[in-house]
Amino acid sequence: MQTYLLHYPATKHVDIYLNDINGTFRGKRIAVGDLYSAAKGCYFPQSVYSMDREGKVVCTAADHQVLDEPDRICLPVKGTLRPSAYDPHENAQLLLSMQDASGAPYALEPRVILENVVRRFHHHGLYPVIAPEIEFYLIDQQAQAMRSQGCFHMAVPSTYAPFIERLEEMAAAQNLPLTGIVSEAEPAQFELNLRHSHQVVEVCENVLALRRLTSVIANEFGYKANFMAKPFSQLAGNGLHFHISLNDRQGDNLFASPAQELNEMTRLCLAGLLHLMPASLAIMAPGVNAFRRLRKNLDEPVFSSWGYNTRSAALRIPCSTEENRRIEYRLAGADANPYLVMATILTGMLYGLENIDGDSEEDILRAAPPLPLFQHQAIAVFQECPYLLDSLGQAFSRQWIHSKLEELTLFEGIVTQEETAISF
């Protein structure tokens, strides 16, 4: 804290916040003089983790205590005091983590859920290494149409130079390891790449911080950064992709093998991911819009499939050297919560390592069952997957199911302009 204030002596305010189950920032602004007392703990209502996407508290039948809005102590997460995108010289931001009434990490906090799953890997002497990619559209709020530059077009940095330079500058200031900004094939669609790391929880923190930072910087330049999974019906959607491998205690990649001769560790992890994939979709696609991205269109997966160097598969084995062999998980939408996405991915890999043998592995890898195409179907499949429910936590799983069903009911009750346009 003292080191930060030495670098940013003009700091006046600090935004202290939690990330709710949807990855939304929930918090408040305090004076910098109150930062020292906040470091010892501050209080937020437990119901922060029972909110839907619109911020409404959704209470499950098993947890009416939420309605009492009890406060819980929240402590700063080490290494997350950063300059804010909102006037970085005078404003900072700090991530918090909640504890329950007994002082244990709060079970509904997505960050805690991911920590628990990662700990299971470490218990086995396995260390996941991940690298995220997140896509978004940069929409000119003044223009009538978006400009297409083409996939990997090198002129994009000059076209959007002020925005890109500012984003790179602020990402560096926030210690976000942004390694690339890539132009996608669609008009004004970009992909943000973050450096691979074995600090799995920290990587997911960085995804949320980068998503927020991108939105703020875009607004400064008259753009809107749109991370919806499917913002335009005729264009490709936005995905949140994770590249993942497993290291041993010595740091050696346990997936290392020739592309056409995947080793047993890789094949078991693939089989586990495929087996849990239909149930996982309730997490990967957190709203109705996310399922529109998974309808047959361009390079987005519609089957629980895998393949070498193909972007139409949900699980892709990218081109790489043997020592850099990895799996790319392509199912999640850009609006998904990265903590929950990664906790679900790792759960699938654990399932393969703990429950699948060589005989059933081949059958699973050959199968490619279709994924649920509607949210209510995905939630129903999720409810019938005890391994995934247990891994994410029964309390969290109940809250997620209840919250998503409430959101779905509200959405389905809306009369759209398309309906009224064709009314008799």
Q: What would you call each of these model-derived segments?
A:
Residues P128-D140, Q174-L194, A225-L246, S280-V288:
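Core alpha/beta catalytic barrel or barrel-like domain that forms the active/cofactor pocket
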Residues D20-I21, D140-Q142, L246-G251, S320:
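Short acidic-glycine loop/turn motifs at beta-strand connectors
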Residues M1-P9, Y17-T24, A38, E202, ...:
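C-terminal accessory/tail domains of diverse enzymes
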